[in-house]
Amino acid sequence: MLTRRITLGISRNLSRGALINARFASSQSYLDSVANLKKDLKKAMIAKDDLRKTTIRGLLSGIKNKEIDAQGKDLDEFALHDLYSKLITQRKDSIEEFLKNNRSDLVEREESEIEIIKNYLGQLPVASEAEIDAKVSNLLTELKQSNPSLQLKDAFKKVDWKAAPSDWRASASMIKASIVRQFKTKS
């Protein structure tokens, strides 16, 4: 029994150390965004703004879960962008359900939370969906001029995926989704 407790204690300490290292390997804008959230949480607590406080706590909880899931991988502003976008989508789905059930009080709360999350989403140094779509559209136009029978897989091969985050200011998943969307509309 004693060895079991010791083993559990050691493994618990090791996992905490891994989380600390993961946070230090993250990008500076990621760290700044998390620090900004914590600062805003403190302000919301002092101002007794329950809606903002609850929303920011939800964001920090989602970030913490993302860090745990990453297990030592670098996290950056694109991971935050994906998380915030996912949370906005969840709230939009909730609004639809609340409207079906005539819960206007909950609809207003969800809409307010969406505005708060969009505020933090706008602070991230990430290209907007419209900017990404414009770059992808230009890329596909150039590729189709040189090769009229362009396939989707060929378009994916032409993107420098290692340089894409810095050049495009977008994550690979955002660029891939835009390529698929644009390719379907141009075909």
Curated annotation (Swiss-Prot):
It comes from the Eukaryota. One of its GO terms (cellular component) is mitochondrion. GO terms for molecular function: carbon-nitrogen ligase activity, with glutamine as amido-N-donor. Pfam families: YqeY. Its main location: mitochondrion. InterPro entries: Asn/Gln_tRNA_amidoTrase-B-like, YqeY/Aim41, YqeY/Aim41_N. The keyword Mitochondrion applies. It is found in: Mitochondrion. Residues 1-24 form a transit peptide. Keywords: Mitochondrion, Transit peptide. PANTHER family: ALTERED INHERITANCE OF MITOCHONDRIA PROTEIN 41, MITOCHONDRIAL. Belongs to the AIM41 family. This is Altered inheritance of mitochondria protein 41, mitochondrial.
